[in-house]
Amino acid sequence: MAPGAPSSSPSPILAALLFSSLVLSPVQAIVVYTDKEVHGAVGSQVTLYCSFWSSEWVSDDLSFTWRYQPEGGRDAISIFHYAKGQPYIDEVGTFKERIQWVGDPHRKDGSIVIHNLDYGDNGTFTCDVKNPPDIVGKTSQVTLYVFEKVPTRYGVVLGAVIGGVLGVVLLALLLFYLIRYCWLRRQAALQRRLSAMEKGKLHKTAKDASKRGRQTPVLYAMLDHSRSTKAASEKKTKGLGESRKDKK
């Protein structure tokens, strides 16, 4: 390289920006959701739900693919495909006349319904979603169990037991607080009654004392009057006796 010629190596700032754009920028993959398992009775129908999350807007090239692997089988076969706004049911397998498309791509829903269930339908169903340019991600699987009569799920029984226990506890607490409220109300009424009786006794005592206070001077006055009358009568009697002696 000739002296004074500009350097052809990238600047440190440009190298750092390139490194951050390639390494540090997050890579977001499409995420597919299904139930873990579903139960159905022979002759009934069951819905296999499938939804997804994507960092991109819903594309016109959005596609859903359902595959089925029989119970104990090794290979999975395609049973349903949705692309370009049209559902396609594969002509291979026993589901070709029993599958119904019930999904809504605008709501990111790729669900299907399987009608007229049979014991041979037991197996694993896989939902795969592509939303270009977001095409990288894992599929999701749901296992179908077909019974003569759908058994009550353990979670439902446990939930019912827990709900019953909580109901009994709440009822007991309500009854306790109701009894306590009635008892406190009765005690308050009794306390008010006793307080009123005490006030009545005090008022009566004060009234009697006031009455006795008013009667005492009258009694003393009557007693003095009686004494004065008696003294005057005795004096008069004594004077009459002395007068009779003088006449004799």
Swiss-Prot record:
Domain Ig-like V-type: 30-143
Residues in compartment: Cytoplasmic: 177-248
Disulfide bonds: C50-C127
PROSITE patterns hit by this protein: IG_LIKE, MYELIN_P0
Pfam families: Myelin-PO_C, V-set
Alphabetically ordered keywords of this record: Cell membrane, Disulfide bond, Glycoprotein, Immunoglobulin domain, Membrane, Phosphoprotein, Signal, Transmembrane, Transmembrane helix
CDD domains: IgV_P0
Signal peptide positions (record): 1-28
Recorded family membership: Belongs to the myelin P0 protein family.
Assembly description: Homodimer and homotetramer.
Protein's name in the database: Myelin protein P0
Organism: Bos taurus
Gene label: MPZ
